[in-house]
Amino acid sequence: MVRYTVDELFHLKPTESLPVQFDAEEFKAIIEKVKQIQALKEEEFNAHGGHFNRRRSSHHHHGRPKVKHTKPKVTTDSDGWSTFEAANKKVNEDEESENVSVAVVPETLKVKPNNKNISSSRPADNKDIIADKQTHSFNAFAALESDEEEET
Amino acid sequence: MSVEEVTQKLESVAVDDNSPKTVLSDSSNFEVKHPLNSKWTLWYTKPAVDKSETWSDLLRPVTSFETVEEFWAIIQNIPEPHELPMKSDYHVFRDNIRPEWEDPANSKGGKWSFHIRSKSSDIDELWLRALLAVIGETIDEDDSQINGVVLSIRKGTSKFALWTKADDNTEALTNVGTKFKQVLKLGDEDKIEFVPHSSTGKYVQATITL
């Protein structure tokens, strides 16, 4: 087996750079390109605060979201009585009344009939039962009397 | 055969001024090269920049060499380890062995490995020392236990690994591991581990620790 010690191999090292059997420039270019891509990725990573474009998960709330409520105004008079003043509510009431007036504006309302029993033999409304009731029963004597009058 | 023996042999063959020039007589226009014991291939693992790239896309042979002079020419023309991007690997493997566990020459082997947290300049020097020890065969046993050597560049650390063809020859593996520690300039407090490829990826268990 041919062996070379480290010193012997260093002794055989040419002082000048020698040509190689492969495209060293292309190899170096690939490595440089990879380094550039990695640098860009790292820059993007740092720009986003140490994480990539993660979508915000639905589990990011660790509690109920904070809703700011205005504190009610309480005034205390000279006798020591505290009075709750819902000043904002008054304004709201006015707004509500305006809303109500708007809601009263007449509109063309489409009445949707209840078709639930439309194919049934049962009347849809009890009033219909009364209306359909036969109000005049047949009177045979009355009918005979009328025939006699006609003959005379 | 040492380099001096090879040189002496060449000089003894030479009888006149027309004798072939070696790197020792003319470092740029030499005609005779110093042969290595084996043909070696330099492989490079490119870091993945696209999710579609597979391992086979990333691992590519760069070039091969069979002489000391060819080796130096390659070393002078490729980036040094500290110039490599993160997640790069250099592999130098014997003959046509692929630097993969699946290669038949590696399937029954294992590797000595050591992680170094060190300055980039030190990594360059240690990688060169490891290469010289491997291609010069001074780290190997007479029955040739070594298949190749790998350098993995990672963030904040570099991993040196020496791949062997067998995982059961404890005496030979211990000798190789001891020399590997010397090449990497490790002290007694530094521990290197030998892990068979068969256990890698499942339950990694070192069989020898030095």
UniProtKB/Swiss-Prot annotation, chain A:
Residues 114-123 have a biased composition (Polar residues). One of its GO terms (cellular component) is cytoplasm. It comes from Vanderwaltozyma polyspora (strain ATCC 22028 / DSM 70294 / BCRC 21397 / CBS 2163 / NBRC 10782 / NRRL Y-8283 / UCD 57-17) (Kluyveromyces polysporus). The gene is CAF20. This is Cap-associated protein CAF20. One of its GO terms (molecular function) is eukaryotic initiation factor 4E binding. Belongs to the CAF20 family. Acts as an inhibitor of cap-dependent translation. Competes with eIF4G1 and EAP1 for binding to eIF4E and interferes with the formation of the eIF4F complex, inhibiting translation and stabilizing mRNA. The keyword Protein biosynthesis applies. Residues 51-72 have a biased composition (Basic residues). Keywords: Cytoplasm, Initiation factor, Phosphoprotein, Protein biosynthesis, Protein synthesis inhibitor, Translation regulation. It comes from the Eukaryota. One of its GO terms (biological process) is positive regulation of translation. Residues 124-133 have a biased composition (Basic and acidic residues). It is found in: Cytoplasm.
